[in-house]
Amino acid sequence: MTHWDITSSIQLGKKCNEKKVLAIALVTVFTGMGVAQAADVTAQAVATWSATAKKDTTSNLVVTSLGSLAFQYAEGIKGFNSQKGLFDVAIEGDSTATAFKLTSRLITNTLTQLDTSGSTLNVGVDYNGAAVEKTGDTVMIDTANGVLGGNLSPLANGYNASNRTTAQDGFTFTIISGTTNGTTAVTDYSTLPEGIWSGDVSVQFDATWTS
């Protein structure tokens, strides 16, 4: 199973500016009475990535997410941008195999706001136009039925080789639904509370070598 770390945010520049101006005003008061001067308005933001490191070159199937996802709210469309999430797949060849199948299934996809609101966002996952869902497997490769995997086709060609084979492809991730408090659904994302949502999107991959 592989997962992407995600953050999503809605930010209002006006609020940030007001906080900065207030801080400057307080400093002015504490440092004495002087001639009033115009002050520059600045803002600063920090992005943080969760990080781990792992190496596995012996398992029969290894899937690695390449990069993280960051959804940003766009006021003009009252929605969030979509993201392309790349992944790398490595398999061990089985010289006795006559067919190979690779499927994916969504495991987790909920982001929760990092405050007391309880607001949530659900992330949809799409693979080459097919939804990856929790209720069933999405076929990515099925050599017995002529599904050779597109960008993952090196796996379809190398599943019965005597060495390891790798290939890369990607999912499309979008925000498909949300709540204001964990229960009340929203139809207009502009009504969501301000803040940052965080969580993991996990997709399980299953590989089958048939002899």
UniProtKB/Swiss-Prot annotation:
Gene3D superfamilies: Fimbrial protein EcpA. GO terms for cellular component: pilus. Induction: Positively regulated by EcpR. InterPro entries: EcpA, Fimbrillin_EcpA_sf. Keywords: Fimbrium, Signal. It is found in: Fimbrium. Residues 1-38 form the signal peptide. Its main location: other. Belongs to the EcpA/MatB fimbrillin family. Part of the ecpRABCDE operon, which encodes the E.coli common pilus (ECP). ECP plays a dual role in early-stage biofilm development and host cell recognition. Major subunit of the fimbria. Self-associates. Forms filaments. Interacts with EcpD. This is Common pilus major fimbrillin subunit EcpA. The lineage of its organism: Bacteria, Pseudomonadati, Pseudomonadota, Gammaproteobacteria, Enterobacterales.
